[in-house]
Amino acid sequence: MVFMARAATTSDAFNAVAEPRRREILNYLALEERPVAEIVDALEMEQPSVSKHLRVLKDVGLVHARRDGRQMFYRTNAAGIRPLYEWAATFERFWRHQLIRVKERAEEKSGR
């Protein structure tokens, strides 16, 4: 069986958040809606770069945008982020199991 490498694309949320600066932007937007200028200042990025990343995040449904006069405001889209959360949550059982094993081994070594 021959496997073809998947082309690098930003057509889905997983590929979009593979870029570290986009994750920074999402983290910054996590609690409230913010204007582009504030994102630029807070993350110390160039405005064209922020706008490009926001466009990608919007295209895959991770953020919503709204215009107020001349300013664009962005906020996270919970429905768009949900698939990322659900995927990451599948590992919760793994880590819980690992922590239980560590606890059991520590208790065995301490004679409990």
Predicted regions span which residues?
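Amphipathic alpha-helical dimerization/coiled-coil segments
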Residues: M1-T9, N27, L31, R82-R112
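N-terminal helix-turn-helix DNA-binding core of bacterial DNA-binding proteins
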Residues: A5-P48, Q71-E86
